[in-house]
Structures are given as C-alpha cells and as structure tokens.
C-alpha cells in the first residue's frame, strides 16, 4: 500500500467503522449488532480468509502458503507458541491489501462495519481520518479461556484434528495471549482506542462501549 495513496484511501473509506482485536473478544457479535442497529453493511474478515488464500500467491503471501502446506500437528502441536505467532500469516498482515480491495468494491452507503483480528493497528491507522472510527477489543486470558471452553475446549474444530488436542489448545491460548499483548502495545503507541474485555463484561456493555467510541 503506497503512502502516496493514503489520503485517497482515507477519503474512499471514510464510511467504514473498524473493529479489530484479539481472538474471541466479541468482535463479530458487536459488529453484527451495530450493523443491524445502524442499518450498515457488515464485512467480516474471517469470512473471506479462504477467498483471500485463493487470490494470493506464494510470492505475495509466503507465510500463508507455508502454513497451507503444513499438516495439523505442524501448525498447532509441534511449534512453540512464539513461533506460531511470528509466522502466522494474518498476524503479519499478509492479504491485508485484499481486504482493502474488497472494501473499495462495496457500496459506500449507508455505512460499513468491518471486523476481525486481521485489522492490525499499524495497517488500519493510516486509513482512518478520524480516530473515533476504529477500536480494538482486548480480551483477558481468563475471558479467552471461557470463550474457548464454551466452544468445546480441546475438541473445538481444528484442535480436535491434531494428535494432541490438549497441547494444541495450550499453544493456541498462549499464541493468542501474546498476540493480544502485541495489539495492546501497538494501539497504545499509535494512540488508538481500545476496550479491555474480561469475564465481567456483558455483551450489552461491550456494544455500548463501542458505540461511545464510534459516537453512534
């Protein structure tokens, strides 16, 4: 993304509200409720990951294509959480240009709510003309644990496809905890809005707090 295009992109994306944050922080729920309430369109970055993988190449998304070539144990069991963090393609911003391509192709009226962990602070900030158009939800480890357990714990989805689901779960939780720490540091350094999400946070509370940031 060329810095020469930043002012133009800010203007083209001024109708967008951005909700980033750690995994399992409530981004999807909040974005869906606000989009319905405000009559906005909704763009969930999780929903387009497979499409973006198809539209990418090993040259522009090398980490993604290495990940695709791994088996489930190589992805989630055999590597240290820090290595998993540093080599996870979406955490490193691969494919973010495809998100922007998608957003530019969508109608600008009446507004667009965009959510997902792929919205990295340093990539989003240059696109936001007003600081109240972006917020990151930061889950505590306890909140993340509760969310994962509610989804089935070690038996949840891809974890159950490994030879050691318990270890895969521990690795995933540690990787995601560290990713949230990275988001916390980066948003603080860039002066961006964040909301801490813990086990006392209700869905309605979280929606209201995001509305305050967005001034809706």
Say what each PLM segment does.
Residues 3-4, 178-216:
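NTP-dependent small-molecule kinase module
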Residues 51-111, 118:
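ATP-dependent small-molecule kinase phosphotransfer cores
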Residues 27:
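Conserved lysine of the Walker
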Residues 19:
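Hydrophobic anchor at the beta1->P-loop junction of P-loop NTPases
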Residues 23:
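The conserved Walker
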Residues 30, 34:
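Hydrophobic positions on the alpha1 helix immediately C-terminal to the Walker A/P-loop
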Residues 38-56:
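Short beta-strand-centered segment that lines the nucleotide-binding/catalytic pocket of NTP-utilizing
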Residues 131-179:
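A glycine- and Lys/Arg-enriched "phosphate-lid" helix/loop adjacent to the NTP-binding pocket
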């Amino acid at each position: 993304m060329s810095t020469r295009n930043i002012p133009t992109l800010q203007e083209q994306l001024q109708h967008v509200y951005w909700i980033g944050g750690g995994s399992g922080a409530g981004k999807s729920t909040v974005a869906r409720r606000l989009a319905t309430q405000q009559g906005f369109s909704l763009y969930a970055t999780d929903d387009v990951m497979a499409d973006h993988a198809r539209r990418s190449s090993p040259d522009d998304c090398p980490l993604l294509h290495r990940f695709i070539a791994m088996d489930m144990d190589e992805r989630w069991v055999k590597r240290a959480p820090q290595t998993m963090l540093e080599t996870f393609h979406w955490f490193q911003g691969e494919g973010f240009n495809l998100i922007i391509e998608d957003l530019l192709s969508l109608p600008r009226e009446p507004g667009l709510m965009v959510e997902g962990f792929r919205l990295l602070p340093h990539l989003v900030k240059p696109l936001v003309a007003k600081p109240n158009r972006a917020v990151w939800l930061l889950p505590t480890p306890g909140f993340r644990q509760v969310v994962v357990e509610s989804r089935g714990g070690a038996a949840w989805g891809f974890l159950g496809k490994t030879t050691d689901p318990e270890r895969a779960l521990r690795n995933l939780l540690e990787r995601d905890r560290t990713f949230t720490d990275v988001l916390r540091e980066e948003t603080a350094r860039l002066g961006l809005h964040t909301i801490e999400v813990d086990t006392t946070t209700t869905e309605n509370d979280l929606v209201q707090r995001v509305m305050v940031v967005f001034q809706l």
